Amino acid sequence: RLGNNRKFAHMQIEFGKYEGAGNDFVIIDNRERVFEPRPALVAALCDRRFGIGADGLMLLEEECGADFRMRYFNSDGPEATMCGNGGRCMALFARHAGAAGERMAFAAVDGLHRAEVLACGGDAGRIALGMTEPHGFAEAEEGYFVDTGSPHYVRFVEDVERVDVRGEGRRVRNLPAFAGTGGVNVNFVEVAGEGTLKVRTYERGVEDETLACGTGSVAAAVVASRVRFPQVRSID
């Protein structure tokens, strides 16, 4: 329930709070259009001091030709591009809500995704999520750019724990070179072994480091497979 705020009327809507690899989300079943995602309202709900608190908000809506549509909103309010960990959480939410079975296909801003609930016990689950084809690979300032459903910058570093993710991430996120995509998510990647990466991500919209980023992990793996170890078939 959102109240005691002059900006918004009192309302009561059921929601789920899901977390995947440290990314947390508010999820609403919006098949009956009960929620109007105004940016100021989304930001208020995601506020960690005065709202529910989340990295983002997602809506499950009806979609012809798929089990449902996933809409993702950044914690600062506007609708955004694909979120990988959000997609995994949405798949489990859809299963819990009866919107899909164990195997499902859902639409998102970047196209159709297929997901499968591999295990489900209580409120937890293990989800396999298919991503759309990465595109736009290019060299960028001291790193690389690739779009994995969201635009990502990837830079390899010697020690990811020593990186000023917030400061350097904010600088790179706002570079003029990335203005055409509305800014970019910034990933700092340490090669911890053959086929093993350590990744820290600064996410646009959250405007800070997050505990994980699904599309960022995919971006790191895509870039690493091209420029660091092209013969490795599996990357952790």
Place the predicted regions along the sequence by residue:
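Zinc-dependent deaminase
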Residues: 110, 132-135
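Short, solvent-exposed secondary-structure boundary/capping segments
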Residues: 123-132
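Internal active-site segments that recognize and position negatively charged phosphoryl groups
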Residues: 137, 141-164
